[in-house]
């Protein structure tokens, strides 16, 4: 109560921030006439003046009023659009590193031009992040006109660009692109083998459009670059055949909240019997340690059949299983579920099962975007997630006032007993809207419901448009015309987000289509455009007279924010509009959160078929259920971040060290340090200083020196011959032999080849060890929760063991680099002139896959297939002099002996470097 009184007297934190911003707006407005009086050339020259002032040491904030006023004037001249005062406030909040919550239709795209221009003056680059390629290309072309007028360069990062095109786009002053592309380019840069192959520069300032979608909805799914592993896919088909006979509640139980399936005792016995009969379970019980793989496959097959539904969670297209994003309804081409789940779904659908992939590099959006020096974002719905955005990213949410008052009416939810009654009521509501000429947007939660409603409307002979993952290409066109009188549009959740629904239709989009039609003469184009423009006002007025855009929600989402996004499509810029959610007791949210009590109440009230409950109390109870889910999801994301922070710190160390190696022309000093560390480790393990010689493991020491350095070192003989040989003298004598042998090889290879070779081996072994470490970390994380049963803190155990694994990886890295370099011998065949860049590119991993929501169709490999990285160097393994084997990784099996002559399996020798 006391806090309420204080807020009433001094205003809320949001009110105080808006008041501060209004003072900036007053300064910008005072400069308007000054810049209006300038001609185009003088106005464009302001950029050079601003940069000169920055170079003299003037702070960036001092330029803000003038820079914003310049952008506003250029926008008026180039775009015919002048930023409103509330848009100036939004731009100021973005510059301050905050999240601006702005209602749909308030012009967020135009707002971003203000801080983007101001911060680009520093010359460090500004990234404007959108959710898909279409919006990135559209914004770069549309508002990019403002920046280009002012002499700034604008780049676009979308899928299917070459490295050269990406490098040029990142070199621009302002770069528009998708969150996935920015993240994948960061990972690719940290897998490059030459500084020239990197495309990004520093992560200076990012403005994220639809920031809630990117930083919250997609935060739990990491960006992953992976490569194929060798695994028998037949097991997925064999296990899939067995689970079809399992019965729910008898053989297994389902936890819908956790999306998990658990076998009962009867189910375990049945699984053991069926697996034994099919030859899968050869020995022991199902849950014996030796059969853990079978348990894993069985669980994933059950989840594929019971939890994951076709047309809701995925669709099958062209013989492939494509995941459907639960938040947007879009296909997530190129993304695959991990841990064998995607393979289980493929087996269920009878399509080709593709091998699982091994992670080569990964990062979450949480950790990627926290690397930017300054971060800001904008969205129409962030206030419900303000606590999480502040806790995890340190971003404050500021609610920006609307330019015009919101005239939308949000009706209370209607709740029916069955889904059949609900769908019938929805169809009747749509029919009524179309008859009175009111445009309707219907939001569904899945493609299945989307197409089911379309089927009902066809039966009722109601014309409509369908927008889901299958109509992704027509998305902008369908949304653009969703505001015409009587239009009915069915869309999965947030499909079409980023494109405004204009009452009367988007005449600009229609004009663009006419201009792009090559079959029309110029005179016909002009006539049609004039007709469109003259007819639009009548359509606009008719749509308003009918009540504006009517939003129908077919069920509540787990998150209130997603529901608010749907509501927010109506009532843009002061237009009228209405919204209504239709629910049934069969809906997932209602079913999970206590629909039994509500069902009993409806029966006691004697409600007939087709009657609905409509009361604010019921709506409030549903919102309370949503808050519970949101709280649980926040806890999950926070916990995931705590685990990922451990890997993130290790990633930072590895990438920092890797970049230092790659930027250096000469890593010989680092190689010498590694050699010293390895020798010290060998001596500490076999002949530790301070321990009597009688207790030294001399055979082990000699074997280790032979294995690592390829040298026959007679340590025992030395000690026999020189009783006074100290530990330090012994180490010095061994090192002399090692350095002498290496110097002899270097004299044959030449200094230049040796330096290049050291760098190449160091980077390749580092990548190989990091890849294996990521897999080990995944395995550790999967089972770490079981430590809780032993009264141990899983997070602390994860941190402790991951550090042990990380240090062990570094030890293995040192030994493998030194061993590889020490055991190489120069071929007597003269080496031809070498193309080191081509050699470096050939060493990169091949057949990569990039996975995350909304990532465009399976990306092509980064490099063409090439021979083994070491081929052509004139370098071979230690072997008989004069014999140089032909090395071809395409013909050597991973478990066959390596042709270099080392005696190791190919996958543990040169194949490991791929």
UniProtKB/Swiss-Prot annotation:
<feature type="binding site">
    <location>
        <position position="898"/>
    </location>
    <ligand>
        <name>Zn(2+)</name>
    </ligand>
</feature>
<keyword id="KW-0963">Cytoplasm</keyword>
<dbReference type="InterPro" id="IPR011130">
    <property type="entry name" value="SecA_preprotein_X-link_dom"/>
</dbReference>
<feature type="binding site">
    <location>
        <position position="87"/>
    </location>
    <ligand>
        <name>ATP</name>
    </ligand>
</feature>
<dbReference type="Pfam" id="PF07517">
    <property type="entry name" value="SecA_DEAD"/>
</dbReference>
<dbReference type="InterPro" id="IPR014001">
    <property type="entry name" value="Helicase_ATP-bd"/>
</dbReference>
<dbReference type="GO" id="GO:0046872">
    <property type="term" value="F:metal ion binding"/>
</dbReference>
<keyword id="KW-1003">Cell membrane</keyword>
<feature type="binding site">
    <location>
        <position position="909"/>
    </location>
    <ligand>
        <name>Zn(2+)</name>
    </ligand>
</feature>
<dbReference type="Pfam" id="PF02810">
    <property type="entry name" value="SEC-C"/>
</dbReference>
<keyword id="KW-0811">Translocation</keyword>
<comment type="subunit">
    <text>Monomer and homodimer. Part of the essential Sec protein translocation apparatus which comprises SecA, SecYEG and auxiliary proteins SecDF-YajC and YidC.</text>
</comment>
<dbReference type="InterPro" id="IPR036670">
    <property type="entry name" value="SecA_X-link_sf"/>
</dbReference>
<dbReference type="Pfam" id="PF07516">
    <property type="entry name" value="SecA_SW"/>
</dbReference>
<dbReference type="InterPro" id="IPR001650">
    <property type="entry name" value="Helicase_C-like"/>
</dbReference>
<feature type="binding site">
    <location>
        <position position="900"/>
    </location>
    <ligand>
        <name>Zn(2+)</name>
    </ligand>
</feature>
<dbReference type="InterPro" id="IPR011116">
    <property type="entry name" value="SecA_Wing/Scaffold"/>
</dbReference>
<feature type="binding site">
    <location>
        <position position="910"/>
    </location>
    <ligand>
        <name>Zn(2+)</name>
    </ligand>
</feature>
<keyword id="KW-0813">Transport</keyword>
<dbReference type="GO" id="GO:0005829">
    <property type="term" value="C:cytosol"/>
</dbReference>
<keyword id="KW-0472">Membrane</keyword>
<dbReference type="GO" id="GO:0008564">
    <property type="term" value="F:protein-exporting ATPase activity"/>
</dbReference>
<dbReference type="InterPro" id="IPR011115">
    <property type="entry name" value="SecA_DEAD"/>
</dbReference>
<dbReference type="InterPro" id="IPR027417">
    <property type="entry name" value="P-loop_NTPase"/>
</dbReference>
<dbReference type="InterPro" id="IPR014018">
    <property type="entry name" value="SecA_motor_DEAD"/>
</dbReference>
<dbReference type="GO" id="GO:0017038">
    <property type="term" value="P:protein import"/>
</dbReference>
<dbReference type="GO" id="GO:0005886">
    <property type="term" value="C:plasma membrane"/>
</dbReference>
<dbReference type="InterPro" id="IPR020937">
    <property type="entry name" value="SecA_CS"/>
</dbReference>
<keyword id="KW-0997">Cell inner membrane</keyword>
<keyword id="KW-0862">Zinc</keyword>
<dbReference type="GO" id="GO:0043952">
    <property type="term" value="P:protein transport by the Sec complex"/>
</dbReference>
<comment type="similarity">
    <text>Belongs to the SecA family.</text>
</comment>
<dbReference type="InterPro" id="IPR036266">
    <property type="entry name" value="SecA_Wing/Scaffold_sf"/>
</dbReference>
<keyword id="KW-0479">Metal-binding</keyword>
<dbReference type="GO" id="GO:0065002">
    <property type="term" value="P:intracellular protein transmembrane transport"/>
</dbReference>
<keyword id="KW-0067">ATP-binding</keyword>
<keyword id="KW-0547">Nucleotide-binding</keyword>
<dbReference type="GO" id="GO:0005524">
    <property type="term" value="F:ATP binding"/>
</dbReference>
<feature type="binding site">
    <location>
        <begin position="105"/>
        <end position="109"/>
    </location>
    <ligand>
        <name>ATP</name>
    </ligand>
</feature>
<dbReference type="GO" id="GO:0031522">
    <property type="term" value="C:cell envelope Sec protein transport complex"/>
</dbReference>
<dbReference type="Pfam" id="PF21090">
    <property type="entry name" value="P-loop_SecA"/>
</dbReference>
<dbReference type="Pfam" id="PF01043">
    <property type="entry name" value="SecA_PP_bind"/>
</dbReference>
